[in-house]
């Protein structure tokens, strides 16, 4: 063979892969196959609501239920059926083609004059609030790095000593949500019995009982301009949402609703005040979230955008953005000033059940029934971190500020309350005390409150 001519492909020596490379290749193939299967299942858009699961089974000509079959088993049966149809080449969405077409079609509805005024007010408010936030961030950035590192390390060591310090029966039914007041001296709870209570956070004594809901309370938020609990106050104090399809506004001096906001066609999930105190947002299983004027009770906006019910909703600290999370496993971030959806959060594989904005204004934490917490970065418009937070559904997630330090608190159906370092997503402390699943958590400084299916409210601190 002439050296200048080189060699042909047929003359190349072939050698078998080593055992290590072969094993790695097989593991890679298995991983990609698993991811492909997850993507296939996600693309099927299997409904979560049992009524829709039954409807899909009926359209497939299958029994809508078997003896002893619960909702989860019924959904798994539908999932397997839809996968089989997909593998056979059938389009599983053909059973609901009309609904699919409606989902894909964009529609625009002219807003009211009141909504236009509200958007302008929100724009002006958010610009001023952003200036204050950036000023605070600059002040923190001027602190020497060693001092911040030492402060963070000291705070983590302090939180690692947190223990169960008090427990109280919160009602006759499971306690779905707890939230600290703006100064931390009190907290409020909402139960499946429809009761809303305010408690002293020092001794866990009940100080007020509100009655107005006829079904499970699942959303609760303190009025941002209410700095301290005053039993004689005529000022707006709380907002709650419940499975009776209503949102209620409360003042401390009255045990019945100050205002009842009606309009949702299905159960209401989370509710959140706008930081300005002028507006309230509510999420519902009617697949919409709504914007309300808290002074007049007028519905300013009914926003669609999810294919399944919406449970979680949260306002960004500046007040310019709102995030919503649905049973369709999709989250969306909306610009309240323009009404546009500016980011889609599509990395969860099961429904999103809670959301919390970081005080920095550009990070959002979402928790899901897929057992994870995900941190999203709006600056990069992408997912920043995934925390395998619990071994079961992550029922709540909250950002907690303690001086210049920030932490994340989560609760899960595995019975745990956990604290996390948001800088590296490392676990700081896992606290166990509830007999059954933990349904909610909140924190103020170094104090944490949790509520559970066991009907108890528990207080934790170092």
UniProtKB/Swiss-Prot annotation:
Cytoplasm as UniProt keyword: yes
Pfam name, any one: WD40
Residues passing through the membrane, by range: none
This protein's record includes keyword Transmembrane: no
UniProt-listed PROSITE patterns: WD_REPEATS_1, WD_REPEATS_2, WD_REPEATS_REGION
GO cellular component, one term: U4/U6 x U5 tri-snRNP complex
Protein name: Uncharacterized WD repeat-containing protein C227.12
Family matches, as SMART domains: SFM (SM00500), WD40 (SM00320)
Source organism (scientific name): Schizosaccharomyces pombe (strain 972 / ATCC 24843) (Fission yeast)
Localization per Swiss-Prot or TrEMBL: Cytoplasm
Lineage of the organism: Eukaryota, Fungi, Dikarya, Ascomycota, Taphrinomycotina
GO molecular function: U4 snRNA binding; U6 snRNA binding
Domain of life: Eukaryota
Keywords from the UniProt entry: Cytoplasm, Repeat, WD repeat
SUPFAM superfamilies: PRP4-like, WD40 repeat-like
GO process annotations (BP): mRNA cis splicing, via spliceosome; mRNA splicing, via spliceosome
WD repeat placement: 170-209, 212-260, 263-302, 305-344, 347-386, 389-430, 433-462
């Amino acid at each position: 063979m002439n050296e200048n001519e080189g060699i042909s492909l047929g003359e190349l020596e072939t050698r078998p892969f080593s055992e290590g490379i072969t094993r790695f290749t097989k593991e890679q193939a298995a991983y990609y196959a698993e991811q492909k299967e997850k993507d296939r299942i996600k693309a099927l858009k299997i409904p979560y609501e049992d009524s829709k699961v039954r409807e899909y089974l009926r359209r497939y000509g299958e029994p809508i239920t078997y003896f002893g079959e619960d909702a989860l088993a019924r959904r798994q049966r539908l999932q397997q059926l839809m996968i089989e149809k997909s593998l056979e080449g059938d389009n599983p969405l053909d059973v609901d083609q009309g609904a699919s077409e409606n989902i894909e079609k964009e529609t625009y509805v002219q807003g009211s004059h009141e909504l236009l005024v509200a958007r302008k007010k929100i724009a002006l408010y958010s610009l001023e609030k952003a200036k204050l936030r950036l000023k605070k961030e600059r002040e923190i950035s001027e602190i020497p790095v060693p001092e911040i590192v030492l402060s963070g390390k000291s705070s983590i060591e302090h939180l690692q000593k947190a223990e169960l310090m008090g427990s109280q029966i919160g009602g006759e039914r499971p306690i779905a949500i707890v939230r600290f007041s703006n100064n931390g001296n009190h907290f409020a709870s909402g139960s499946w019995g429809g009761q809303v209570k305010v408690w002293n956070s020092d001794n866990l004594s009940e100080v007020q009982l509100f009655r107005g809901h006829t079904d499970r309370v699942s959303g609760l938020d303190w009025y941002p301009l209410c700095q301290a609990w005053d039993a004689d106050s005529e000022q707006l104090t709380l907002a709650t949402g419940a499975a009776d399809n209503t949102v209620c506004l409360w003042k401390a001096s009255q045990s019945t609703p100050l205002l009842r906001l009606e309009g949702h066609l299905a159960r209401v999930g989370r509710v959140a005040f706008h930081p300005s105190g002028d507006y309230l947002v509510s999420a519902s299983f009617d697949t919409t979230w709504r914007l309300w004027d808290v002074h007049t009770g007028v519905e300013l906006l009914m926003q669609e955008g999810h294919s399944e019910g919406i449970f979680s909703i949260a306002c960004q600290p500046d007040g310019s953005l709102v995030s919503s999370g649905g049973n369709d496993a999709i989250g969306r971030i909306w610009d309240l000033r323009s009404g546009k959806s500016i980011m889609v959060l599509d990395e969860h594989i099961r429904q999103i059940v809670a959301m919390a904005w970081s005080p920095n204004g550009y990070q959002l934490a979402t928790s899901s029934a897929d057992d994870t917490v995900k941190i999203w970065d709006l600056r990069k418009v992408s997912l920043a971190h995934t925390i395998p937070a619990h071994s079961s559904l992550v029922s709540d997630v909250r950002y907690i500020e303690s001086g210049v330090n920030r932490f994340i608190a989560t609760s899960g159906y595995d019975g745990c309350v956990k604290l996390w370092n948001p800088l590296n997503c490392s676990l700081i402390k896992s606290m166990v005390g509830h007999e059954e699943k933990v349904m909610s958590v909140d924190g103020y400084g170094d104090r944490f409150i949790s509520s559970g299916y066991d009907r108890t409210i528990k207080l934790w601190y170092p």
